[in-house]
Amino acid sequence: MSAQDLSPSRRSIPEPRAMLELIKPVTWFPPMWAYLCGAVSSNVPIWENKGVVVLGIVLAGPIVCGMSQAANDWCDRHVDAINEPHRPIPSGRIPGLWGLYIAIAMSLLSLVVGWQLGSWGFVATLLGVAAAWAYSVEPIRLKRSGWWGPGLVGLAYEGLPWITGAAVLLATADTSPGFPIVMMATLYALGAHGIMTINDFKAIEGDRKLGIKSLPAVYGPEVAAKIACTVMGLAQALVITMLYLFSKPYHATAVLVLLCGQFWAMSVWMRDPEGKAPWYNGTGVVMYVSGMMITAFAIRGFTV
């Protein structure tokens, strides 16, 4: 490793605040929420299994998601030096190889905690950790692709935690997730491709310089925003259709109302795709994840 790979800093140990910033608490919500959606959709009493639920939520958010952020920031330190030089690693607040050490330590911690959730929890954790490194690290680095990268993150952030939350609770009843749970989790995970694309709007300049083919970098902000909106909209349209087919008209209508709200937010976002991407994250995405919980309640205990 060359000297250029190390953060220029006179510090020998990381700043405590910088370590918290490195694992980005703001990113923990989606997998925590998805795990809770899975627990709800299982129709297994949550209060009676609150220990498993809380442990799974902590694993999905602060531990696995936090680990993925640390790994991504370490592997992205050259990009961040261009786009966001104030971040912990390029700024030197986390010096030397400390970013890598933190990511590795949290990977091991993830597996230890995942083991406490049984075979379902451990295998899911193993997949989540593998996905995090596959997304960021060379030579795999799936984030170089604007299609594979967001798709992998969507599955890891939404689909995998949802199915895991349901599977861990259902294991207490000696059963496993059925088709409705797997299908709805998968649809929302596929739709999350659009949500993950939104996050790429803040790094267009650096992505282009370093050859990362995110959708905004390759197609431009306007086309990328249209792709993201289409993906999110189609996934939810399929969810709504299936809920009607499952004879859950009230839940389907509620998700439809939220989708209409997203269409309004999308129209606002499209006026300035690059500038309003953070705004859409705080409006349209909130409606998207609200629909996830409505869907979870709709399919709890439902079999086909």
Curated annotation (Swiss-Prot):
Major subcellular location class: membrane
Transmembrane spans: 26-46, 51-71, 94-114, 117-137, 151-171, 178-198, 227-247, 250-270, 279-299
Coiled coil residues, start to end: none
Localization: Cell membrane
GO molecular function, one term: transferase activity, transferring alkyl or aryl (other than methyl) groups
Keyword Phosphoprotein: no
Domain of life: Bacteria
Listed pathway(s): Porphyrin-containing compound metabolism; bacteriochlorophyll biosynthesis (light-independent)
The name this protein goes by in its record: Bacteriochlorophyll synthase 33 kDa chain
Organism for this UniProt entry: Rhodobacter capsulatus (strain ATCC BAA-309 / NBRC 16581 / SB1003)
Originating gene: bchG
